[in-house]
């Protein structure tokens, strides 16, 4: 059951109220989530997880939901949340106090911030509550040492780069004032005193040097993983200057798309589109000038019914139809699997695993597999490569009109070839940006003179892609 919250609607003016205008009624009520859980139990689910991808479920809300789930379901209930906005540790303790069967945690060096709370902290709470954990904490301590090294190795992908201070609950003694915070948190959870609970839990996290609550994530209402993914990708695209604008646009884009829950893949679709919209604004273009193919499919209805209906006028603007249109499986076409003649005539996807990778993540897999085949070929043909000479040709000046990249990304697919006649607004190329596919159209009618890029290559915003003769 994907936990999410209603967006913050703009405050209505007195004139709007007098005209009878109202903001939409709440969608994501306790009953909404319970009904979803009951539906899945009826379908044969063995367990229900309340999955809070954004870390936005506060302790008071889980204190309402957990007894409701436990009294209406016959199967175990699990709780999954993140610490990004500062609720995670307090919410997990609240869930434990109110009867949860299972909670999701992370091991110390990978815990806190955009991740789940540390199992070591939950272990201390459970010991104080007289709850036995079916976990070998000695093994956890050994694993944690290995994870420290692994996280160091992954530093390039670490959006936080803040390690908690070393701690082992089996061998280290807590200072009396910190131990008192644990007792205060338990008392606050039992009495449903959310303010005191959060104060105690955040003091515990601060003592161990876990990341502080991220206010930007709290306001934008996004999952921690979605946030770190967006940061990492914007860094790769040298576009970190639009991060704050993109984050602020997420609630707006999500509402326009029918309030989908921000969980994979819809979290990435909405996040990438918010980036597109921020780039549009930066380039003085209307929002939604550039939309990913996946966002079009979401708005069209191909990912299924959204919690609230999409405005037909918006659907027409984005997807070219006013009607919700489910995905037609009979029209599915597998990804092309070309022979790479330049790398020894091997196929791009050589086995079932690679074919599946192409089908699931075409925008990423194509570039990944091409580089893999190239590296393998170069490793076995070093002598031949050394003997080859390179014929350097003088670059021909551009005389026609040019289709440019509206954003940084990778060339996923070129849809035209030299000599093709194209019309204004025709799709000429697919650009992969933030793992989403974006159709790039020609602003001109004419004949394709030259393709200025290659599939699989990275381009910057404003890069020249295709030359068109008018």
Regions found by a protein language model. Give the residues of each.
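Alpha/beta enzyme core
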Residues: 1-75, 93-100
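Terminal or standalone catalytic/regulatory effector modules within metabolic enzymes
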Residues: 187-398, 406
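Structural motif
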Residues: 51-53, 78-82, 106, 406, ...
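Structured functional modules or segments
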Residues: 396-470
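Short acidic loop-to-helix transition motifs that present clustered carboxylates
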Residues: 4-5, 31, 84-88, 410, ...
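Short, proline-centered helix/strand-breaking motifs
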Residues: 76, 358-363, 412, 439
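Catalytic alpha/beta core domains of metabolic enzymes, predominantly
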Residues: 53-284
């Amino acid at each position: 059951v994907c936990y999410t919250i209603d967006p913050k609607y703009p405050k209505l003016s007195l004139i709007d109220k007098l005209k009878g205008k109202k903001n939409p009624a709440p969608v994501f009520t306790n009953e909404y989530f319970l009904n979803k859980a009951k539906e899945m139990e009826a379908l044969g689910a063995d367990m229900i997880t309340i999955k809070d991808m954004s870390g936005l479920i506060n302790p008071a809300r889980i204190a309402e939901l957990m007894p409701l789930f436990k009294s209406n379901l016959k199967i175990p209930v699990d709780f999954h949340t993140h610490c990004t906005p500062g609720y995670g540790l307090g919410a997990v303790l609240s869930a434990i106090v109110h009867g949860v069967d299972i909670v999701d945690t992370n091991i110390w060096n990978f815990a806190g911030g955009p991740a789940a709370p540390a199992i070591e902290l939950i272990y201390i709470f459970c010991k104080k509550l007289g709850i036995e954990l079916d976990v070998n904490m000695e093994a956890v301590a050994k694993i944690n040492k290995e994870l420290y090294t692994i996280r160091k190795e992954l530093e390039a992908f670490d959006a936080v780069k803040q390690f908690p201070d070393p701690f082992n609950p089996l061998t280290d003694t807590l200072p009396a004032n910190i131990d008192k915070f644990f007792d205060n948190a338990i008392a606050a959870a039992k009495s449903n005193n959310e303010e005191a609970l959060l104060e105690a839990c955040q003091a515990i996290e601060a003592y161990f040097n876990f990341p502080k609550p991220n206010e930007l994530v709290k306001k934008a209402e996004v999952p921690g993983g979605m946030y770190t993914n967006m940061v990492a990708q914007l860094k790769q695209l040298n576009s970190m200057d639009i991060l704050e604008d993109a984050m602020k646009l997420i609630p707006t884009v999500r509402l326009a798309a029918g309030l989908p829950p921000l969980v994979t893949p819809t979290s990435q679709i909405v996040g990438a589109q918010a980036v597109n919209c921020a780039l549009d604004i930066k380039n003085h273009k209307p929002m939604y000038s550039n939309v990913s193919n996946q966002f079009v499919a979401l708005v069209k209805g191909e990912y299924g019914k959204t919690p609230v209906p999409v405005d037909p006028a918006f659907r027409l603007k984005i997807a070219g139809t006013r009607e919700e249109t489910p995905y037609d499986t009979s029209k599915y076409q597998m990804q092309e699997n070309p022979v790479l003649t330049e790398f020894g005539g091997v196929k791009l996807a050589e086995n079932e695993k690679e074919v599946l990778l192409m089908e699931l993540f075409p925008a990423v897999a194509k570039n990944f597999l091409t580089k893999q085949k190239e590296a393998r070929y170069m490793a076995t043909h070093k002598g031949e490569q050394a003997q080859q000479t390179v014929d350097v040709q003088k670059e021909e000046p551009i005389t026609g009109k040019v289709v440019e990249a509206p954003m940084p990304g990778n060339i996923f697919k070129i849809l035209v070839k030299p000599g093709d006649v194209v019309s204004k607004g025709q799709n000429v190329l697919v650009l992969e940006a933030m793992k989403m596919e974006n159709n790039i159209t020609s602003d001109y009618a004419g004949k394709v003179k030259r393709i200025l890029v290659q599939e699989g290559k990275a381009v910057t915003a404003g890069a020249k892609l295709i030359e068109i003769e008018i």
